[in-house]
UniProtKB/Swiss-Prot annotation:
Name this protein carries in UniProt: Homospermidine synthase 2
Higher taxonomy: Eukaryota, Viridiplantae, Streptophyta, Embryophyta, Tracheophyta
Cofactor(s) the protein needs: NAD(+)
One function term, GO molecular function aspect: deoxyhypusine synthase activity
Pfam families: DS
Its job: Catalyzes the transfer of an aminobutyl unit from spermidine onto putrescine. The resulting polyamine homospermidine is a precursor in the biosynthesis of pyrrolizidine alkaloids.
Transmembrane segments: none
Keyword field: NAD, Transferase
The protein's annotated pathway: Alkaloid biosynthesis; pyrrolizidine alkaloid biosynthesis
Keyword Transport listed: no
Length: 370
């Protein structure tokens, strides 16, 4: 009996104290920022990767984004018989970066972060929903205000106030928007009829960016820096309302916006990216996420991918899908580097930019003496 009891205890001990495989040198050790060392925001952000949970995912997103920014064709194997001139040219070939975001982020203060990226040509292609277009212009005309998530809808409606989460948009803002955009539509219609101008969503957005002529607008900077902005859902929002009112007010064929030309242009951004690598950063889900991923499927997947959203995968939605699902479709390369950060993008994205794009911009400014 004693022997049997000893065997049972030994078995229990071996189960409880199972020998571990060594992780030394293969995994980062978990540890957070030590505030005894003073306040250093850059070191704090760098410490995210070893903090654990979504902080580590955010840290990984910073690393992958910096890899997008640092990659040059010259880093890849140089072909035989490559001339010095070709080698020099390879150094100038950078990763093409696609940035997608949902409209609520332009309603929020993330608009200013995106404006910074467009102003300094840090991204190459932008994709958003209609609200992400109109809210940018509307903010040039009138303000959005901080409210509360709990404000009663019926009470707000009686006051002509619209709620976006805990943001408040006075309905008067849309009246100002109509006063601004309808004369532009009038001129666009004239050009369509007299010059056979073929309007696409991206061409229309560029025209509106030109017309707003306001440096607080990310679409102004996209127009100025020739960054294409794609919005296949251009009629799904206030712009759609304005197109409706404009069309019913004008006899005969109204303004025509061709979305087919834009899907060709969008897919070509990915198809003809080679020999560049492509990187995708997607804030939120829905249309911008799928549109960017689908275009990159045309080249057998993006090389770098960062998703930031709070959507879950359990309902089979594309919004909630993890990067590995995109790999199965060829939307992210099977050899690509990808991460999903489960976080509100209004928190995560400015922090990511602070430790990636903004750092690169600051270093470049010092080198160039600006």
């Amino acid at each position: 009996m004693a022997e049997s009891n000893k065997e049972a205890i030994d078995s229990a001990r071996s189960n409880v104290f199972k020998e571990s495989e060594s992780l030394e040198g293969t995994c980062a050790k978990i540890g957070g920022y030590d505030f005894n060392n003073g306040i250093d925001h850059s070191k704090l952000l760098k410490s995210m990767v070893s903090t654990g949970f979504q902080a580590s995912n955010l840290g990984d997103a910073m690393i992958i984004t910096n890899q997008m920014l640092e990659w040059r064709l010259s880093h890849d194997e140089v072909p035989e018989h490559c001339s010095e001139e070709e080698k020099k040219n390879r150094e100038s070939v950078k990763c093409k970066i696609f940035l997608g975001f949902t409209s609520n982020l332009i309603s929020s203060g993330v608009r200013e972060t995106i404006c910074y990226l467009a102003q300094h040509r840090m991204v190459d292609v932008l994709v958003t929903t209609t609200g992400g277009i109109e809210e940018d212009f509307i903010k040039c005309l009138a303000s959005t205000y901080k409210g509360k998530f709990s404000l009663p809808g019926a009470d707000l409606r009686s006051k002509g106030l619209n709620r976006i989460g805990n943001l408040i948009v006075p309905n008067d803002n849309y009246i100002k928007f109509e006063d601004w955009i309808i004369p532009i539509f009038d001129q666009m219609l004239i050009e369509q009829k007299t010059q056979n101008v073929l309007w696409t969503p991206s061409r229309m957005i560029a025209r509106l960016g030109k017309e707003i002529n306001n440096e607080t607008s990310y679409l102004y900077w996209a127009y100025k820096n020739n960054i294409p902005v794609f919005c296949p859902s251009i009629t799904d929002g206030s712009i759609g309302d304005m197109l409706y009112f404009h069309s019913v007010s004008n006899p005969g064929p109204g303004l025509v916006v061709d979305i087919v030309q834009d899907v060709i242009a969008m897919d070509n951004e990915a198809v003809h990216a080679s020999p560049q690598k492509t990187g995708i950063i997607i804030l939120g889900g829905g249309l911008p996420k799928h549109h960017i991923c689908n275009a990159n499927m045309m080249r057998n997947g993006a090389d770098f991918a960062v998703f930031i959203n709070t959507a879950q995968e359990y309902d089979g939605s594309d919004s909630g899908a993890r990067p590995d699902e995109a790999v199965s479709w060829g939307k992210i390369s099977s050899t690509g580097k990808a991460v999903k950060v489960h976080c509100d993008a209004t928190i995560a994205f400015p922090l990511l930019v602070a430790e990636t794009f903004a750092v690169k911009k600051e270093k470049a400014s010092k080198v160039n003496g600006f």
